[in-house]
Amino acid sequence: MAHERGHLQLPRADAIRSKLIDTFSLIEHLQGLSQAVPRHTLREILDPACQKKLMLGDQEQLVRFSIRARRMGHITHAQRLLSRLRVRCGGRPPLSLWAGWVLDSSIFSNFIISLIFLNTFVLMVEIELMNSTNTSLWPLKLALEVTDWFILLSFIVEILLMWLASFFLFWKNAWSVFDFVVTMLSLLPEFVVLIGVSADSVWLQLLRVSRVLRSLKLFARFPQIKVILLALVRALKSMTFLLMLLLIFFYVFAVAGVYFFKEYSRSTIENLEYNMFFSDLLNSLVTVFILFTLDHWYAVLQDVWKVPEASRVFSSIYVILWLLLGSIIFRNIIVAMMVTNFQNIRNELHEEMTHLEVQYKADIFKRRIIQRRQQSESLRGTSQGKVSEDITETSEATDEEKSEAEESEEEKSEEEKSDVEKSDEEKNDEEKSDEEENDEEKSDVEKSDEEKNDEEKGYTEKVYSGRTFVERSYAERSFAGKAENEKVQKELKEKAYPGSPPNSSSHDEAFAADDTYLENLDWETLVHENLPGLMDMDQDDRVVWPRDSLFRYFELLESLQYNLEERKRLQEFAVQALMNFEDK
């Protein structure tokens, strides 16, 4: 079927095809091995007792391997490396495998986290002792300097281990690149001092301050902080155009402020506190941002009103309009978008967690089903053992009964010989008594035969109770399925002909009308009408399908997956065609 559909490959269709092959053993038929059908399962091979028995008795038989899909979690780089042929066939494990093992160990991770906290504490103490001239504190400063170098070297060793584990994956990970940049920025001032740059240089002081950025290495260590940062980045991405619009309004109001407050900025009146706020474009942008935060807006407005040349109306309109647009409207929009984005992220995480919970419950349910099957198989094995014991007991009982019957027959033959040797007179006199005794013996023999037959029937019923129970269960299931089908047909008949009695003379006509009704009935209505009855049925009942029907069912189900995929693509093509048509 997959070759008929071309290069299109669907996981569902492949799963259905594998199920079909597993059910009907098509691999053996295609390879000409239909006569060699596997008789044993993998469970029997794994069982030591069964394996020993099979190896002693039947070594050349095939084994059916039941391959099931297994959900794998996060596959680490070390696991990928272990599955490579070069590593598996090599004599010694590579250094990259050892480096990955060290990086993944909890001891090393906790050691790096403790160094990050220690680095924060050391920087805090160094800042406090920076301007101190007390000579008694020099050993403490030396210890802090040594600790700082030890922390820096530990971070460099960590980066080297990451490179040794996988150099290309290191540069593909954004958190690893961030870690590398922070470490190199803290290492750069030491090299600059070795080159000969003065320690009092401003750039060198800035580079030394960059050592504080080592505390940001915690972001890459805790997944919770990563989630918060990713949520912030995602929220800012969704607000890109809103921020662009806000920046445009910032620029417009900054330029307008330079023109509106020109007299105020050039005024010679003394005691003006904010006359430099609108002197040029940069100061005007800073002032607009201050007004955006609702800070000093009334003080600035009162200071502007001190200048008679500045219009009170235009200055008031400028400030109030910017407060309405920027501080009230834009700020609330930003807050609302941030809240909605965080809510969407939370809903997505909640859906993912519920999906994982449902998947976990489904796995537990599957395990219970497997345990139930194993228990049923063990019960069948015990019942078969009991049946074999009953068979041996009945065979021994029948042998004993046969020996007793032979002994009784020999005694009767001896008695008859002694009776023949008697005289004729005694025979004539005792004919009547003999006849009566013979009648009594016949009745006793018949009774004993009947009792033997009853006992044999009881034994046979005990012997074959297990087998007949299994056969009855299968027959009862098929009969129950037929009864359910007849019940559904009766309900459909009653819906189609509500006034007709069930036992009418025109049974054939009603049955023909029922067939026509089922043919004309829509599939969805048929399913909806029969769905309550199907839900009320016992879920343990199984319907046995014929082999050809089951094979056809799998084929149709596989073709349905391809048809659904083709329908989806046709819908996409139709949408694309309509969009192109509207563009033209």
UniProtKB/Swiss-Prot annotation:
Report membrane topology.
Multi-pass membrane protein
Notes on activation and inhibition: Activated by intracellular alkalinization.
A Pfam family per the record:
Ion_trans
Q: Which stretches are Extracellular in the membrane topology?
A: 130-138, 199-201, 261-279, 293-312
- Residue spans crossing the bilayer: 107-129, 139-164, 174-198, 202-220, 238-260, 313-339
- Protein's UniProt keywords contain Transport: yes
Parts of the chain on the Cytoplasmic side:
1-106, 165-173, 221-237, 340-584
Q: Which GO terms describe its biological process?
A: calcium ion transport; fertilization; flagellated sperm motility; sperm capacitation
Instruction: Give the catalytic activity.
Output: Ca(2+)(in) = Ca(2+)(out)
Q: Could you name the domain of life of the organism this protein comes from?
A: Eukaryota
Here the segments flagged for biased composition (Polar residues) are 376-386
Acidic residues bias locations: 390-418, 426-443
Any GO MF annotation of the entry: calcium-activated cation channel activity
Q: Does the keyword Transmembrane helix apply?
A: yes
Q: Which chain residues lie in intramembrane regions?
A: 280-292
Which family is it part of? Belongs to the cation channel sperm-associated (TC 1.A.1.19) family.
What PANTHER family does the entry give? CATION CHANNEL SPERM-ASSOCIATED PROTEIN 2 (PTHR46923:SF1)
Described purpose of this protein according to its UniProt entry = Pore-forming subunit of the CatSper complex, a sperm-specific voltage-gated calcium channel that plays a central role in sperm cell hyperactivation. Controls calcium entry to mediate the hyperactivated motility, a step needed for sperm motility which is essential late in the preparation of sperm for fertilization.
Task: Describe, as the record does, how this protein assembles with itself and its partners.
Answer: Component of the CatSper complex or CatSpermasome composed of the core pore-forming members CATSPER1, CATSPER2, CATSPER3 and CATSPER4 as well as auxiliary members CATSPERB, CATSPERG, CATSPERD, CATSPERE, CATSPERZ, C2CD6/CATSPERT, SLCO6C1, TMEM249, TMEM262 and EFCAB9. HSPA1 may be an additional auxiliary complex member. The core complex members CATSPER1, CATSPER2, CATSPER3 and CATSPER4 form a heterotetrameric channel.
Question: What name is this protein filed under?
Answer: Cation channel sperm-associated protein 2
- Organism in which the protein naturally occurs: Rattus norvegicus
The organism's lineage is:
Eukaryota, Metazoa, Chordata, Craniata, Vertebrata
